[in-house]
């Protein structure tokens, strides 16, 4: 049976894509046919092959199954803003059924999937629709990426509470050091380990000079249910 996980973050720009790539590398290293899925992406570069979003390209390059770009990222919008604003600017709508249809395609080709969301847990996709509504519909186990900075404890606890209020399982969290580590960072990490009722499955250091291809060592999939 295919293992499926949804990646959310305490905020935008906390390293969800980096964490998703690390998870894919770790899964591949222990024999899985692993794929990344970015159903909705905003902001792209127009190439000879069409619109391409950098986050989706990263997931595609870190998967070890053969997928087309449109399978990894079926919905891409020009404006680099919240999905509900970006799609409205193009006169389009996001249907949750489209996200589910894309997920089924990925499931047919892989046995381990990481689905990367957009922004945080309550990111809107349209009028009265949140990204988390779709996660709830699919009953996806959730992995929380925490950008290690001042305020992250509050953001993490609020997000964890919101996930559980949906009746969903927070199966693990990843600490991503989005700035050079300080003494305070270690205090934040210790407090999060004490307060979050989920295992720490990854601790990714400040990676200013470390190749992105070498991320698997920062992930412990043994802790992931």
Curated annotation (Swiss-Prot):
InterPro entries: DTB_synth_BioD, P-loop_NTPase. ATP binds at residues 13-18, 55, 116-119, 176-177, 205-207. Mg(2+) binds at residues 17, 55, 116. Pfam families: AAA_26. Homodimer. The keyword Mitochondrion does not apply. Its cofactor is Mg(2+). One of its GO terms (molecular function) is dethiobiotin synthase activity. Keywords: ATP-binding, Biotin biosynthesis, Cytoplasm, Ligase, Magnesium, Metal-binding, Nucleotide-binding. It comes from Baumannia cicadellinicola subsp. Homalodisca coagulata. It is an enzyme of class 6 (ligase). PANTHER family: DETHIOBIOTIN SYNTHETASE (PTHR43210:SF5). One of its GO terms (biological process) is biotin biosynthetic process. The lineage of its organism: Bacteria, Pseudomonadati, Pseudomonadota, Gammaproteobacteria, Candidatus Palibaumannia. GO terms for cellular component: cytosol. This is ATP-dependent dethiobiotin synthetase BioD. Its main location: cytoplasm. Substrate binds at residue 42. It is found in: Cytoplasm. Its EC number is 6.3.3.3.
